[in-house]
């Protein structure tokens, strides 16, 4: 959304098309000056798992750009560990299957949106390359 703060009209040089083109150029210049970045959703993940599987699950979380926040004995299930982590939402898609495989069906997890973080630059180019293309000016 943009708000035009000042402008002028001339009966010969002003037309709807001229204003549309001026708005398009101003938008592109403003966007470039704003230095935009891509954000990705980060989720809080809570994994309940058997004690023997904690190392393997921590490896999975780290490989998926996650951060382990802490581990505690589970208050809900005796002999189990509760692992808290933050992970990008895009890395959680098949986590249920992975947790079940590593824990031999004993583990489970929950995920809840927490905040947004800037997408790493290494992944930004891939996202941009795979984004749908729009015409330069759709007037």
Language-model features and meaning:
Residues 1-139:
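Accessory interaction regions appended to the cores of large information-processing enzymes
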């Amino acid at each position: 959304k943009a708000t035009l703060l000042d402008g002028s009209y001339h009966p010969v040089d002003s037309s709807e098309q001229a204003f549309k083109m001026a708005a398009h150029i101003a938008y592109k210049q403003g966007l470039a000056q704003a230095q935009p970045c891509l954000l990705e959703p980060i989720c809080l993940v809570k994994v309940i798992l058997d004690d023997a599987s904690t190392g393997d699950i921590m490896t999975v979380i780290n490989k998926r750009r996650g951060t382990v926040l802490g581990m505690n004995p589970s208050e809900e299930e005796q002999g189990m560990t509760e692992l808290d982590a933050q992970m990008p939402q895009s890395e959680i898609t098949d986590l249920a299957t992975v947790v079940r495989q590593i824990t031999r069906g004993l583990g489970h997890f929950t995920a809840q949106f927490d905040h947004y973080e800037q997408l790493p630059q290494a992944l930004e180019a891939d996202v941009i390359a795979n984004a749908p293309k729009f015409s330069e000016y759709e007037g």
